[in-house]
């Protein structure tokens, strides 16, 4: 039996001098021990998800904790059968979380070390979910929400996190005077966004400390009141959260049946994320629409070595046709 793989999720807002040089040093160490994952290092802190066997991940945690800036860094841990990443990336960026505030004329960025929402532990957050006078706001991307979310949470009409500040301003009158509690995967986005809400004038702003990942592991709440699965940005795509009464809420793009399997549309110019069973992925050549299924650069066709005749036959089976190739 192969050794279990540990997946570590973590972040910390802390000033890092010469962050670019530290990113290079960080990458060198990670590669030297065989760690895999994706890490962002910025002037404002560090944010990463990495995976490896017990010995490798322990070496990494010990090395990170040996730096006084990260001596109290909180690693959230999952055990898996396989690696969550294929390669190791450490990149320097201006911020570990980009709210788009400067781009969208929302004044300067937020420093969570100076202003952030009140921390709620899993038990307190569950109480907030059950409180009719509390607004629970999901701060993640739309495709993350569609795979799974807390029961009753508000789904902002946005495509990605950077659109959230404008959406909140547009809907301010709906919950400005109410208690607002926000949540995200591991907590890093909420640290910054809850601070922005405080600066915007919201009087009572809370955040799920440690994010959904921590809520699902809490021995008391055991992920209760979470519907679906949690989206993660690695090879796993999704992880279970609710250990009390788990449900599947996402539906197959093609037949509407319960499905938690995310794939990207095979048209490289679309690339939309859709839910699809393996059977329907093959049946519809992973195209989200007739146009994408017949697109000349359909990646499912090339990846699976389908001949043009085989491709045309699959489309014909679902009542669609493959355009003829023009010849000179």
From Swiss-Prot:
GO terms for biological process: tRNA modification. Coiled coil: none annotated. It is an enzyme of class 1 (oxidoreductase). Residues 130-224 form the Rhodanese domain. Gene3D superfamilies: 3.30.70.100, Rhodanese-like domain. Keywords: Oxidoreductase, tRNA processing. The active site is at 184 (cysteine persulfide intermediate). It catalyses: uridine(34) in tRNA + AH2 + O2 = 5-hydroxyuridine(34) in tRNA + A + H2O. PROSITE patterns: RHODANESE_3. One of its GO terms (molecular function) is oxidoreductase activity, acting on paired donors, with incorporation or reduction of molecular oxygen. Its EC number is 1.14.-.-. CDD domains: RHOD_YceA. Catalyzes oxygen-dependent 5-hydroxyuridine (ho5U) modification at position 34 in tRNAs. Belongs to the TrhO family. This is tRNA uridine(34) hydroxylase.
